[in-house]
């Protein structure tokens, strides 16, 4: 019983506190005419989209009786290196796609490429162990967690740091199946109905954007950062 409770708590942390990740679906990322300046005209508000995947054979979705086969593996998009708003968008898309891929495969490798400071990796280790120990898997949805950006552009909060508010939710059919017969829906991990509000915190380090998440209620806005949000300067 203690093991189950521990895993349940870990999933709650991983999926809820770890931003309740976003959706891994088709991309709308488009190139800027000038990569040295931010795209201040385009609105990025809305459903997050991503399409940078590695072909790994025929994808067979998971069911209650078997885990997924060959789920599409996200690869870091080149735009993640662009010091622009578009670069931040690409990094967030990769973070979310990597988290959903982890839920379906137990493979944490892509996630490490965007969480280079290991801010959220420890929250995801329960999923790695679930697959590694052959004690269970996720089924019911190709994107267990989805979300959308609720702001047109990110807000600058430091010399090399930005934050971007998102609204996230669990897929109602996403279910953790344990090999001993128990099942746990992602929705049951929720502390209440509705969506979750989070911030993605982005920082440009060593030529690439790194991403972590932070509950919106724990983040406060300063006058200087609010003033800079209307025109993102990267």
Tell what function each PLM region has.
Residues 15-19:
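Hydrophobic helical h-region of N-terminal Sec-dependent signal peptides
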Residues 63-140:
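Core segments of small alpha/beta cavity-forming domains
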């Amino acid at each position: 019983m203690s093991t189950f409770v521990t895993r349940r708590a870990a999933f709650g942390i991983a999926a809820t506190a770890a931003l309740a990740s976003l959706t891994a679906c088709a991309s709308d990322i488009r190139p800027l005419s000038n990569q040295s300046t931010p795209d201040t005209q385009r609105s990025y508000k809305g459903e997050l989209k991503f399409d940078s995947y590695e072909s790994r054979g025929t994808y067979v979705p998971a069911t209650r009786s078997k885990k997924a086969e060959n789920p599409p593996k996200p690869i870091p998009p080149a735009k993640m290196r662009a010091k622009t708003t578009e670069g931040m968008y690409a990094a967030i898309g990769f973070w979310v796609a990597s988290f959903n891929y982890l839920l379906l495969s137990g493979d944490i490798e892509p996630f490490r490429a965007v969480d280079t400071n290991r801010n959220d990796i420890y929250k995801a280790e329960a999923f790695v162990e679930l697959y590694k120990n052959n004690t269970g898997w996720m089924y019911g949805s190709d994107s267990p967690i989805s979300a959308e950006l609720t702001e047109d552009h990110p807000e600058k909060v430091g010399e090399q740091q930005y934050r971007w508010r998102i609204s996230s939710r669990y897929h109602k059919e996403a279910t953790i199946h344990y090999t001993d017969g128990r099942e746990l829906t992602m929705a049951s991990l929720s502390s209440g109905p509705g969506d979750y509000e989070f911030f993605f915190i982005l920082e440009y380090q060593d030529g690439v954007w790194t991403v972590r998440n932070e509950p919106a209620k724990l983040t406060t806005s300063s006058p200087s950062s609010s003033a800079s949000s209307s025109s993102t300067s990267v």
